[in-house]
C-alpha cells in the first residue's frame, strides 16, 4: 500500500514536470532556428573574472548516487576558481547541505522547488542569471 502511494506521487510529479519539458523543448527548437550565435551577446566569448555555479540536486535522498555524483563533480569544477571569483547557488536541499557542510559560501539556495514544480519558478531563476550575465556582473554561468 505504501509503495503504491509512493509510486502514485512519483507519477504525479512526472506529470507536473511535463509542461516544463514541453516549454524547454519549444525554446530549444526556437533557438536553433532563430539565433545567430555570432551576434547574440549570450554566446559572447569574454575573459572569466566572476563565475556563478548553479548546483541542481534533489531535496531528499533515496535516489542512489545521484546527489553525491553531482556534488563531487561540481566540487572538482569549483577547484578551478578562487573564492573571490566564484558564486555558488544551489537548487535543492541536498546540494545546499553538501556545500554548506564543507564551508563553501552558498550565496543563494532554492529549496522545495520540486515540491510544487512550475515552469514560472525555473524561468524566474533563469531570467535572473541571464540578466546578471548580460549586465556584465558575471562572466560565466555554469
Language-model features, listed with the residues they occupy:
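Conserved loop-to-helix interface motifs that mediate assembly, gating, or partner/ligand docking
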Residues: 1-142
Amino acid at each position: 500500500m505504501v509503495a503504491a502511494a509512493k509510486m502514485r506521487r512519483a507519477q504525479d510529479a512526472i506529470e507536473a514536470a511535463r509542461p516544463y519539458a514541453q516549454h524547454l523543448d519549444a525554446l530549444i527548437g526556437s533557438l536553433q532556428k532563430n539565433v545567430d550565435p555570432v551576434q547574440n551577446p549570450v554566446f559572447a566569448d569574454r575573459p572569466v573574472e566572476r563565475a556563478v555555479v548553479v548546483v541542481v540536486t534533489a531535496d531528499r535522498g533515496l535516489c542512489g548516487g545521484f546527489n553525491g555524483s553531482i556534488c563531487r563533480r561540481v566540487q572538482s569544477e569549483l577547484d578551478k576558481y578562487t573564492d573571490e571569483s566564484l558564486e555558488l547557488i544551489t537548487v535543492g536541499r541536498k546540494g545546499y547541505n553538501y556545500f554548506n557542510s564543507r564551508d563553501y559560501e552558498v550565496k543563494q539556495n532554492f529549496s522545495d522547488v520540486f515540491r510544487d514544480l512550475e515552469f514560472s519558478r525555473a524561468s524566474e531563476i533563469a531570467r535572473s542569471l541571464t540578466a546578471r550575465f548580460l549586465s556584465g556582473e558575471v562572466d560565466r554561468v555554469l
